[in-house]
Design a protein with these regions (language model features):
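HTH-adjacent hinge/linker in prokaryotic transcriptional regulators
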Residues: 1-66, 70-71, 77-85, 89, ...
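Conserved phosphate- and dinucleotide-binding cores of soluble alpha/beta proteins
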Residues: 1-2, 16, 94-222
């Protein structure tokens, strides 16, 4: 057998290489979604497009929709039909700019300090503005989606912003590409039970999605 000390040392080395996230009693796969924004845009773009198309079917005319930043939500706005009439609230300048040519979409851009990795605003001013808005839907980005570890991301301030928006939204929806399922990042956004719907790629192994469904989350395959 392998000694506990050897296992602990191996876990420490893997954690140092960011291949896993150590948790109480063991370890989880570390989310690979840590590259810079433009590098992440090139990863799995076909899958992100399918998830985005499924997400758009959840949006009803005249709703108020919070849109998080990130590369999957960038695909979501690119797939939005030109005749869709909604109000989009976002703390992502890049998401706002994508919607400039949509004549029926009202865009509310929330400001703050720019977190360059995700191209989103963060900070106290951002949270204060969010507290005055109520939304029907929040399409939230995350780097890890795990039944026990919850919904996680790689930055503490970004996690706080996402949590604040979810608290002001009737339903939170996550578009989760396969590499995010079963993975975890250092900062908890919320327990998985607080998410309404997760849109996943069709054909994802059952062991990745069944634990999520068991916690009451609605799963949509795309």
């Amino acid at each position: 057998g392998v000694s506990e000390d050897t296992i602990r040392r191996d876990l420490r080395e893997l954690a140092a290489e960011r291949l896993l996230l150590r948790v109480h009693g063991g370890a989880l796969p570390a989310s690979p979604a840590v590259a810079d924004f433009h590098a992440r845009e090139q990863v799995g773009s076909a899958a992100k497009t399918r998830l985005a198309q499924a997400a758009i079917r959840l949006i009803m005319p005249n709703q108020v929709v919070f849109l998080d930043g990130g590369t999957t939500n960038a695909q979501l706005v690119r797939q939005m039909p030109r005749d869709l009439a909604v109000t989009v609230v976002t703390h992502s300048p890049s998401i706002a700019v994508e919607l400039v040519d949509h004549p029926l979409i009202e865009v509310e851009l929330i400001g703050g300090r720019l977190f360059k990795h995700s191209i989103v605003a963060v900070g106290a001013a951002c949270i204060e503005t969010i507290s005055g808005i109520r939304a029907d839907l929040f399409f939230m980005g995350a780097t890890g989606v795990h039944a026990e570890a919850g919904v996680t991301t790689g930055d503490r301030e970004e996690a706080a912003i996402k949590r604040a928006i979810a608290g002001q939204s009737a339903e939170t929806v996550i578009l989760a590409t396969s590499e995010k399922l079963g993975a975890a990042s250092p900062y908890l956004i919320m327990p998985i039970e607080e998410v309404g719907t997760i849109i996943v790629e069709s054909g994802v192994p059952d062991d990745r999605v069944k634990p999520l469904a068991a916690r009451g989350v609605t799963l949509i395959e795309a």
